[in-house]
Amino acid sequence: MGKQAKGVGKASLLALSVMSILAMDGYSAFAQDAPAKQVFGNIALPSAGPSASYGSYAKGCQSGAVALPTEGQGFQAMRLSRNRRWGQPQMIAFIERFAQDAQKIGWPGLLIGDISQPRGGPMLTGHASHQIGLDADIWWRPMPDRVMSADQRESTPFISMLDKSKFLTVDDRKWSPLNAKLVMLAASYPQVERIFVNPAIKQKLCQTWKGDRTYMGKIRPIYGHDEHFHVRLECPPGAPNCKPQAAVGAGDGCDKSLAWWFSKEPWAAPKKDPNAKPPKPPRPVMVSDLPRACAAIASAQSASAGATLIRNREASAMPAAQPEMDTNAPSVTPNALMPPADIPRPSSRPSLN
């Protein structure tokens, strides 16, 4: 039997198991239902079976996730205690390939932040997205020339690329042409759908990038993201349960849509009605609000340590698509000034879904 046929067979078995679990009283494992972040945020291991994404980037889950190794050629995983270095095989293969390609342009190595929880889903703290194993945060801070201890990976501070004494301004003491080359390299991979950065960083790229601007439109401005950039992969081919995001519009994004971020509107506090009653607390997202398969995935048998190791090796062997830009430009040494305090961020954020 060929590899493709075997893969189809495994996928069919997973689909049958999911359907059978769902057939048992609807949500047998969660008959009383529960807040999804409490369920998925407390699962330590991925589910057994084939890898797949279910739902959308901000409302879904994943099965058969693969763990990014704690370190590899050109990268180290950070904040290990969060247990958020789990992704789809395509994401793990992308990170490993991108890390090697980044070193070719002179970047010392990648520090990898959150990817997803073992079975995806909403998190107890932090992200609205990162739910289906196809999102990853990559620090702007370059990797040191040593393997960090677990404690160092917890305590090493972020480096903001902004000048906190000014409004939405990149700090040229910390930002360098190599930072620009790094994020533009990331955008050049065909499987990368979007990259989220701070509006000031997007503006800096628009003003200073002299190379090929074909992939500039993939780089999207968003609140925060001054200490890391957020890479989002497209739904993999042949993934019917992964809900794709609307395509990025034409153009490089260096237009009125970027200028809006530098107006008062996105930063203004919402107007309060003094006569209005206090708003009710928002209803938590429940397991039943996610795609139906997610209840089965949350209650499915955990992958064994041996199976997880095999999946990790298979993901590492998976060929990642080549970047589509020239990576042979001269190297540039990154700046490494330490940052001031975090940038204040509005409480209201647009959806990343």
Regions found by a protein language model. Name each.
Residues 33-36, 153-353:
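Catalytic cores and adjacent binding grooves of peptidoglycan-active enzymes
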Residues 117-172, 231:
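Acidic/His-rich structured neighborhood in mature extracellular/periplasmic domains
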Residues 106-108, 132-136, 191, 225-229:
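Envelope-exposed proteins and targeting segments
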Residues 32-59, 290-292:
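N-terminal low-complexity, Pro/Thr/Ser-rich intrinsically disordered segments
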Residues 48-113, 174-184, 189-192:
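Active-site acidic/histidine clusters and adjacent loop/turn architecture
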Residues 19-28:
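C-terminal segment of classical bacterial N-terminal signal peptides
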Residues 2-15:
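Bacterial N-terminal signal peptides that target proteins for export
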Residues 35-48, 94-125, 196-218:
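Extended, low-complexity, intrinsically disordered C-terminal regulatory tails
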